[in-house]
């Protein structure tokens, strides 16, 4: 019974985002994201990421925006699933062009109804996607939102120029 109470107590803890400050929040959300690519020279924790792809590779960049009430409903979507979906959705754009996703940034706008623990759940889904597909989280931003949750994911990938597949190259079957 004691163990069940401890789990319930941990679940019920609510840390206000404003109580941490920007840098402590970033550190808490990104502490378990390892760097997996040599091309990631500097990731989270500086003013900008530093990325250097080897010669011969082109950089592919895609951005996806997800808005609560438009692209997802939190009544039916756990935050961990949403984080995974947001990340993998951007990876798929890179894969569609025959590239390999390498780096990811995640920016979120959150209303006061979200706690730090909620953002940790969102980032747990992103972390799982990054781990599964070998992608580095290299930056992002957080901001207050008056109307729910907004997630913007930017994914960078690499491909050899001669191997890139464009939509314009699609042929009817």
Q: What are these model-predicted stretches?
A:
Residues 42, 74-89, 114-124:
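Glycine-rich anion/phosphate-binding loops
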Residues 66, 101-172:
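Glycine-rich anion-binding loops of enzyme active sites
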Residues 86-97, 130-133:
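A short, N-terminal amphipathic alpha-helix
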Residues 50, 90, 98, 137, ...:
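Residue-level signal for inorganic ion chemistry
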Residues 43-46, 90, 101, 148:
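Short Gly/Ser/Thr- and Asp/Glu-enriched loop/turn motifs at secondary-structure junctions
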Residues 7-78, 97, 106, 124-130:
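Extreme N-terminal cap/leader segments of soluble proteins
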């Amino acid at each position: 019974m004691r163990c069940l109470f401890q789990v319930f107590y941990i679940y019920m803890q609510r840390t206000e985002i404003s109580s941490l400050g920007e840098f402590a929040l970033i550190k808490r959300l990104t502490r378990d994201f390892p760097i997996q690519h040599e091309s990631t020279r500097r990731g989270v924790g500086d003013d900008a990421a530093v990325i250097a792809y080897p010669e011969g590779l082109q950089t592919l960049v895609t951005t996806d925006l997800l808005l609560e009430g438009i692209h997802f409903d939190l009544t039916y979507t756990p935050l961990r699933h949403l984080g995974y979906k947001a990340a993998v959705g951007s990876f798929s754009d890179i894969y569609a062009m025959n590239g390999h996703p390498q780096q990811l940034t995640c920016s979120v706008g959150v209303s006061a109804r979200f706690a730090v623990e909620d953002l940790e759940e969102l980032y747990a889904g992103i972390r799982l996607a990054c781990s599964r597909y070998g992608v580095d989280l290299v930056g992002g931003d957080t901001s207050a939102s008056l109307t729910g949750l907004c997630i913007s994911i930017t994914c960078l990938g690499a491909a050899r120029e001669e191997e890139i597949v464009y939509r314009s190259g699609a042929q009817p079957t």
